[in-house]
Amino acid sequence: MGWLTKILKGSSHKFSDGQCNGRYREDRNLEGPRYSAEGSDFDKEEIECAIALSLSEQEHVIPQDDKGKKIIEYKSETEEDDDDDEDEDEEYMRAQLEAAEEEERRVAQAQIEEEEKRRAEAQLEETEKLLAKARLEEEEMRRSKAQLEEDELLAKALQESMNVGSPPRYDPGNILQPYPFLIPSSHRICVGCQAEIGHGRFLSCMGGVWHPECFCCNACDKPIIDYEFSMSGNRPYHKLCYKEQHHPKCDVCHNFIPTNPAGLIEYRAHPFWMQKYCPSHERDGTPRCCSCERMEPKDTKYLILDDGRKLCLECLDSAIMDTHECQPLYLEIREFYEGLHMKVEQQIPMLLVERSALNEAMEGEKHGHHHLPETRGLCLSEEQTVTTVLRRPRIGAGYKLIDMITEPCRLIRRCEVTAILILYGLPRLLTGSILAHEMMHAWLRLNGYPNLRPEVEEGICQVLAHMWLESETYAGSTLVDIASSSSSAVVSASSKKGERSDFEKKLGEFFKHQIESDSSSAYGDGFRQGNQAVLKHGLRRTLDHIRLTGTFP
């Protein structure tokens, strides 16, 4: 009893005062409600201790004088009633405790539901923003294509520029000459200012007559005094002004694109970037970026890699240059496969190598399908020694990479797959898609798939590369998994990297476009067949069908 008294001295004092002259029952009933009202300030343990203390004091009060005897006698006479009251008090206190607990649970549940509702609304709002942005980008691409078509039409129209002359003249060098006879002024209203044209010089063209100062170029707003002028949408232009506004310019040399021997304006345009350039740049050695394929403009310098490739500065911004730097991305690709329930159990070495080392390794490989203009990744099955890029090079004079450290690496075969080799110096998204492609080769070999035709093996590998790019494009938003029946929605761990630049997002769309528009039989046709199969049947059923038949379903 000592430790209870120490904790609840106030409560002990109040209950002991209520035990004299037979008024214990009445005082306890008065004290009970007040105590329950204050009980919200105590936790359950304090209330239970108070009840135990009260009961203990009632049972152990044994006075020694005559008055004490009276009290004891009174208690024994009313002992049964007191027990009932005590039971009622305990029941009341327990009811209060249960009510308080229920209220706490209800409030907590309401708070949880409110928080979940708020998060769901925030997620929905974010998804709507991303979808709106995607629609905006699609609209911009559509407008770019429309603008390109309009440029082509304008280029043709330029060849048929309108030659407008005045009525028969005495001086052929003067476009502004009077009529050989007088016309009443009421019959001559200037199309430009709607005022009458009096006696004097005037210009007759475009189905009307003009004051010389009213017939102006729509671009520079200066009078057109030349014998010839150009038209666009019923608006007149100086020939030079029209050319400046509507004649296509080369995005590489920044000059007007010249006409061909037939007198027509002919130029090339990249199907994705819409970069316009003179046909001559395809023959004069103008370099292209090895990643995005854009030509190098004359006022911009591309970075020169050790193996001769050139890299634009935008692609350089996210380029992966050595094996160590690529390891986090390699782990992300493995996590991507785990999310598809296609975990690669074997720890396969992954190395970044130069182009020469990749070509040598490809020659030593006994089997494989490599029909691309340039091999950028390889899944090895044979023991070889390859040279890997050990340390990231730095940029030296003339935008050349220098001080790159390499070392030979002996690859020992411990399973069906020896290593995965990736070409160094490519942007993160391109490196990741190549890794996802080669990882699928490894998965097929480690899981006992038979020797497949190139269209089937390369096609399904391209499907996985495309799926990874899709997950990167929509990272952080709601994904509709294209392999819906085979796995849950896959969100790449790269979504933790934060917001990517607009160019990197555009670059991801370009790499998807490359896969989708590939014209080769193994990679292009194979991807389109495999992608249709996955969309229709799901990834898991497609893989099961390939295992059984060696073909797409």
UniProtKB/Swiss-Prot annotation:
SMART domains, alphabetized: LIM, UIM
Disruption phenotype: No visible phenotype.
Molecular function via GO: metal ion binding; peptidase activity; ubiquitin binding
Annotated Acidic residues bias: 78-91
Entry-linked CDD domains: LIM_DA1
Modified-residue entries (Phosphoserine), positions: 166
RNA-binding keyword on record: no
Pfam annotation, one family: LIM
Domain UIM: 42-61, 87-106, 122-141, 149-168
Keywords: LIM domain, Metal-binding, Phosphoprotein, Repeat, Ubl conjugation, Zinc
Record-level GO BP terms: regulation of DNA endoreduplication
LIM zinc-binding domain mapped to chain residues: 188-248
Post-translational modification, as annotated: Polyubiquitinated by DA2.
Coiled-coil regions listed in the entry: none
Main function: Acts redundantly with DA1 and DAR2 to regulate endoreduplication during leaf development. Together with DA1 and DAR2, modulates the protein stability of the transcription factors TCP14 and TCP15, which repress endoreduplication by directly regulating the expression of cell-cycle genes.
Entry text on domains: The UIM domains bind molecules modified by monoubiquitin or ubiquitin chains and promote coupled monoubiquitination.
Subunit structure and binding partners: Interacts with ubiquitin, TCP14 and TCP15.
Protein name in UniProt: Protein DA1-related 1
Organism: Arabidopsis thaliana
